[in-house]
Amino acid sequence: MKKCVLLTSLAIMTFATIGVQAATLSTSKNIELLVVDGKKVESSYWSPTESVELADGKHQIVVRFDGEVKNGSKNTIYTTRPYLFDLNVADKDAKIVLPTLTTLSQTTAYFDRGADWALEYTDGSKEVLKTVELKGDGFGSFSNMEKLVAKYNSKHGIVFEQGYAVDLQEVAVKVDEQGKVQITGDSLTQLKMWYTKASAKEKKAFKIWAAEHDFN
């Protein structure tokens, strides 16, 4: 009986381990992980976070280049704006990579013409990432990365459901080849999409309206 219980427990543990697939996302030299799925990546100058474990599914990643490059006979620190991209994890380790950048002129020219961020997998294959360069208002706009990303997500109808990035506009709005727009998805998805796009004043008005109605 005890043997049966033990075998059953081991089977459950094995099933649970298999069911939760994950992959490691790491960064190459001078690439800084800033935000993962809307949450700031805790890091420091002396102890930067160079990798994260991600469960299978769609994730939102924000990174930037932050490294020392040559400027004539001197060294200088070059830091870019944050870049945001979506990543579909399928139990496959990957590294975020850029070409080797050594001088200030080379680095500036590379990012000015549009950087090609890529994922490099353990088998040597690469995938070019579709990134968005985040832009803030004023010098201090990049001091709070979570807030900057939240503002972007609110504007574009992106939320996180059970830890995964979901573009509500893609889920709730369908555009055919003729450009005809069709509202799809269930009512809850549509409500979430419009709520994320609402202003603070509109959200407050909606909450008051909802409180005044009996939905039981």
Curated annotation (Swiss-Prot):
Keywords: Signal. InterPro entries: UPF0319 (IPR018635). Residues 1-22 form the signal peptide. The keyword Signal applies. Pfam families: DUF2057 (PF09829). Belongs to the UPF0319 family. This is UPF0319 protein PBPRA1013.
